[in-house]
Design a protein with these regions (language model features):
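Short glycine/threonine/proline-enriched tight-turn/helix- or strand-capping micro-motif at secondary-structure
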Residues: 1-12
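Short hydrophobic beta/alpha edge segments that flank linear recognition/processing sites
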Residues: 2, 30-31, 57-72
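Short polar/acidic secondary-structure junctions
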Residues: 7-9, 22-24, 68-71, 82
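A structural signal for short beta-strand/turn segments enriched in small hydrophobics and glycine
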Residues: 10, 16-18, 54-66
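Zn2+-dependent peptidoglycan hydrolase active-site motif and core
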Residues: 12-50, 80
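Peptidoglycan cell-wall recognition and remodeling modules
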Residues: 41-47, 68, 72-75
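C-terminal soluble interaction/assembly domains
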Residues: 43, 47-62, 159
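Acidic, glycine-rich catalytic/binding loops that coordinate metals and/or anionic ligands
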Residues: 52, 80-159
Length: 159
């Protein structure tokens, strides 16, 4: 959860397609954006959604206004990240305090029916460094220009 003022602008974290934009139970007004490689971001308790299902959005584009709809007692954004439906901590890729992107790529492995997200990628084939980076991202500001985040899905033999 990210504390906000009433009706602050929520922006898309990456390029993608809006999969859901509607009132949804305890989440209140919700926007779910599907990005490349199975990544989804979710933004809920919105006062007003500015996009609808099927809309194509760019990184940094306004998608909603913050609120406290659903099961919420104060204005905030409930922000989730998912890979193929599995939740993972957004702090693995975002530094919300500094407004930067922590990683340029992440590694996902399947453990039975669960997807495990890691940030250390020992594979020599990956040109991008998995070390922490300080790239601004558009959740708060439209300065992150890449618009997408590489996600490496490895099977058990490649671990």
């Amino acid at each position: 959860d990210i504390k906000t003022c009433a009706k602050d602008t929520i922006r898309a974290a990456f390029d993608g397609v809006v999969r859901m934009a509607k009132p949804y139970y305890a989440y209140g007004n919700i926007v779910v954006i599907r990005h490349a490689n199975g990544l989804e971001t979710l933004y809920s308790h919105n006062f007003k959604n500015l996009v609808k299902s099927g809309d194509i959005v760019k990184a940094g584009q306004p998608i909603a206004l913050t609120g406290r709809t659903g099961r919420a007692t104060t204005e905030h954004v409930h922000f989730e990240t998912r890979i193929n439906g599995e939740h993972f901590n957004p702090n693995l890729i975002f530094n919300l305090k500094e407004g930067t992107l922590r990683r340029e790529c992440i590694k996902c492995t399947r453990n039975g029916s669960k997807i495990v997200v890691k940030t250390h990628i020992p594979d020599n084939r990956i040109a991008q460094s998995p070390k922490e980076v300080k790239l601004p991202y558009p959740f708060l500001d439209l300065r992150y220009s890449r618009g997408d985040m590489p996600i490496i899905l490895l099977n058990n033999r490649e671990k």
